[in-house]
């Protein structure tokens, strides 16, 4: 499964409350601060077997490494990955992840309220995720139909089960390939 990587850099207007604001922002969404050094912060979200099926994309396994350079420059390295069977690539949600970090910049520099904006991002992510799950279910149903036809034609019961698995995996592979290509092209323009 292709992972999502992004690096964002921005200038900070006021450095006095930078670390506490960064901690507030990420901890409000359930990230855990595991490293808190002078010029570096690391926030993580641990993985579970169900990461790819979680509707809230901010609950997927993630690592956010923040470097403070020259006291007024912040560099964020954001990595999201999903593991296991039946997952949607995090690359499909790259625009939502970018907006999430843009909201951080607005919060740090302009003290803008981010909670309602991030809740809206989570809602959009859930809607996208439900659409992708519906496509997977459609693929399973198509595989079930084809498997049943083959089972009835040959009398081999195993072909019915095999149709479901093939329907699911082929839908997952085609959908992820399309989503990766679509999002990669959007970011290269």
Where are these regions (language model features)?
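Ser/Thr-rich, low-complexity intrinsically disordered terminal regions
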Residues: 1-7, 15-131, 142-151, 167-189
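Alpha-helical transmembrane spans of integral membrane proteins, capturing the lipid-embedded, hydrophobic core
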Residues: 136-141, 161-165, 169
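Hydrophobic alpha-helical transmembrane segments
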Residues: 149-165
């Amino acid at each position: 499964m292709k992972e999502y990587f992004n690096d964002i850099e921005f200038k900070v207007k006021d450095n006095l409350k930078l670390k506490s604001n960064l901690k507030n922002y990420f901890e409000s969404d359930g990230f855990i601060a595991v490293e808190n050094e002078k010029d570096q912060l690391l926030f993580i979200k641990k993985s579970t077997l169900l990461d790819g099926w979680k509707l809230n994309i901010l609950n997927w396994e993630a690592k956010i490494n923040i470097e403070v350079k020259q006291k007024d420059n912040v560099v964020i390295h954001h990595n999201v990955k999903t593991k296991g069977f039946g997952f949607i690539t995090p690359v499909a949600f790259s625009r939502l992840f970018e907006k999430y970090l843009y909201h951080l910049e607005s919060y740090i520099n302009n003290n803008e309220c981010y909670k309602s904006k991030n809740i809206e991002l989570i809602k959009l992510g859930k809607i996208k995720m439900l659409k992708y799950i519906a496509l997977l279910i459609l693929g399973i149903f198509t595989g079930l139909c084809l498997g049943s036809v083959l089972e009835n034609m040959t009398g081999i019961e195993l072909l019915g089960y095999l149709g479901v698995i093939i329907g699911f995996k082929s839908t997952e592979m085609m959908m992820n390939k399309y989503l990766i290509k679509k999002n990669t092209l959007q970011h290269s323009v």
